[in-house]
């Protein structure tokens, strides 16, 4: 057995924040920029060996994360500061490690997760934004957030989300359990906050697209329940844009004792 093989293997979890506007999504792909590729490159430089990461949720092109969780295995023995400050020094400015935690061998960023939470930020104003143009979705028609909130409550619990599932979704089942969904106005911003055990492809953006139709008065509040019951994607509204969507937190069993930080994004309180 070589000296390298005799060294212990460490399993490490990281909290990751990123602005997804310049990336073709989380997942590593040939010849395009991905968050995973940039993170693995930075980790490999610090570890001085090739590193592969596994994430809690693979976000699409243009989608952001303030609470993404990843894990990786390494034989490199480093101080926590190396996995935070050291890795951040090797990352582009729009990706950052927020925390580090050594985890037991049975931990998996995706399969150990019990819930994911997303926030979708709509800038509801007649005129488009400039500074936050890649971090919010602009919708110029006035939205009634209270109407959207009432309409959304039919989505709670375990349901078949075929009407809000992308045609190309590869999940074996359209059934998901929504634990909460809240629509709140903060001045010119309307935020849709949704937590579920997992999500089918484009589920949040498809729900938001339809909720905006309700909020704008183009559809009745009862429309969301009708869409859910219909199990037909063609009846729902267009998919909302990627730039307003953030993966803000991932839940794990308490015994893993992972850090819990403010979710954000931007000005949003927890």
UniProtKB/Swiss-Prot annotation:
Quaternary assembly: Homodimer.
SUPFAM superfamilies noted in UniProt: Pseudouridine synthase
Gene3D superfamilies per record: Pseudouridine synthase I, catalytic domain, C-terminal subdomain, Pseudouridine synthase I, catalytic domain, N-terminal subdomain
Residues the record marks as site: Interaction with tRNA: 58, 78, 110, 126, 139
Name of this protein: tRNA pseudouridine synthase A
Keyword Zinc: no
Gene Ontology terms: biological process: tRNA pseudouridine synthesis
Source species of the chain: Klebsiella pneumoniae (strain 342)
Record NCBIfam families: hisT_truA
Annotated segments matching region Interaction with tRNA: 168-172
Record's keyword annotation contains ATP-binding: no
Region (RNA binding): 107-111
Positions annotated to bind substrate: 118
Role noted for this protein: Formation of pseudouridine at positions 38, 39 and 40 in the anticodon stem and loop of transfer RNAs.
Single GO MF descriptor: tRNA pseudouridine(38-40) synthase activity
Keyword list, A-Z: Isomerase, tRNA processing
Catalyzed reaction equations: uridine(38/39/40) in tRNA = pseudouridine(38/39/40) in tRNA
